[in-house]
Amino acid sequence: ASTPAADKDLIARCVCIKLNGGLGTSMGLQKAKSLLKIKGEDTFLDLIVRQVKHLRSISGTPVRLLLMNSFSTSADTLAYLEKYAADGFADPAQVELMQNRVPKILADGLSPASCPEQPELEWCPPGHGDLYPALLGSGWLDRLLADGVKYAFVSNSDNLGAQLDMNFLRW
């Protein structure tokens, strides 16, 4: 079935934002959780790319995928996306929204954590609530608005059941 022109216009004004800052450590992976294999050799990230490519296909527009990475997930995610370079998913300037980082605070006394032998352990990502400050502070919000984006579909990178629902866009 073909996609109605009004729906194509709505899809064209949407960005798909995936929260991709978490590591899969509880599942034995020291990389982004989105790089876990979930079916055969396919990862969450492979299926996310397929979902966005499908939206591009049915709308005939370059629907944007934006991954909110953390300092812990950026490098492996971008390296993995190299296999999708021909589809426009490998350029960090086009697909990456970097989450901020905040100092780890010790529960006892609320002072900053100190780890001189591994200073990177003194920092942590602030979590999903950082989406709005990261969009604003990175300049992505202005870029998206300038590109005519009006709607943002946001979900965790490991939630493949969450997909863009045209009923919400039509409302």
What positions do the PLM features span?
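Domain-scale recognition of functional cores that engage charged ligands
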Residues: 2-15, 26-171
